[in-house]
A protein has these predicted regions:
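Conserved alpha-helix/loop element of class I SAM-dependent methyltransferases that forms part
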Residues: 15-35, 45-49
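Class I SAM-dependent methyltransferase SAM/SAH-binding core
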Residues: 37-39, 43-91
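A short acidic, Gly/Pro-enriched loop at the edge of an enzyme's catalytic core
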Residues: 87-102
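A short SAM/SAH-binding and catalytic strip from SAM-dependent methyltransferases
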Residues: 100-113
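A short glycine-rich, Lys/Arg-flanked "PGG" loop and its adjoining helix->strand segment in the class I
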Residues: 115-127
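Conserved beta-strand signature within the Rossmann-like core of class I S-adenosyl-L-methionine
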Residues: 128-136
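Short alpha-helix
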Residues: 160-176
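Core SAM-dependent methyltransferase catalytic element
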Residues: 177, 184-205
């Protein structure tokens, strides 16, 4: 289908690469170190933000081959080795405790089974390893929240399964990883229904 194969991936990459979202990415991605697993690497928007002096290798997981094709230029220009794996993040083909840092930006909103994905993250992340996240989700204001619930069925179709109402702290707390730091705010120049942002660091225990 033309929409899902060509138009939708490019629109999502464009929206997720807008300035407010890129500013949020710069707050967490440079903190990654060692062997890094990026969940939902998509079109590779985070790749230029990694610190080449801290990161040994980036393993990017994404089920969308269309998105991965959009990432090729950034991968080719990266000073850090990037390996792409085309698979659902609920079945990560990596050994237990083999990853130092996991990065996840604007992906927990879309995965069909966030708890299953986080269970896999916890399995492959070393004890004491960092989970760096920046996600949009459930807004605190009642009027915004009501609009999110009304819009969500249509939004999920338009935005490849993206949910507007997921509570990121609740999802993380259920995973067994401990939230070390977390900040929230409405992103500037962004519609409030999609602009309430959670970002921070969780530690694997």
């Amino acid at each position: 289908m033309l929409w899902s194969r060509f138009i939708q991936p490019r629109l999502i990459s464009l929206a997720c690469g807008s300035k407010p979202f890129m500013v949020q990415r710069t707050k967490i991605v440079p903190l990654a170190e060692g062997n890094v697993l990026e969940i939902g690497i998509g079109s590779g928007l985070n790749i230029p933000l990694y610190d080449k002096d801290l990161v040994k290798k980036i393993i990017g997981v994404d089920p969308s081959t269309e998105m991965q094709s959009l990432a090729k230029k950034r991968i080719n220009e990266s000073p850090v080795d990037v390996e792409l794996i085309s698979i659902d993040a609920a079945e990560i083909p990596l050994e237990d405790q083999s990853i130092d840092t996991i990065v996840c930006t604007y992906t927990l909103c879309t995965v069909p089974n966030p708890q299953g994905v986080l269970k896999e993250m916890k399995r492959v992340l070393k004890p004491g390893g960092k989970f760096l996240f920046s996600e949009h989700g459930h807004a605190p204001d009642e009027s915004v929240k009501k609009f999110q619930y009304k819009l969500e069925p249509v939004w999920k179709f338009l935005a490849d399964g993206c949910h507007l109402t997921r509570s990121i702290p609740e999802i993380l707390n259920k995973s067994g990883m401990k939230i070390h730091t977390m900040e929230t705010m409405y992103l500037p120049s962004t519609p409030r229904f999609v602009g309430f942002n959670y970002w921070g660091i969780a530690i694997n225990h």
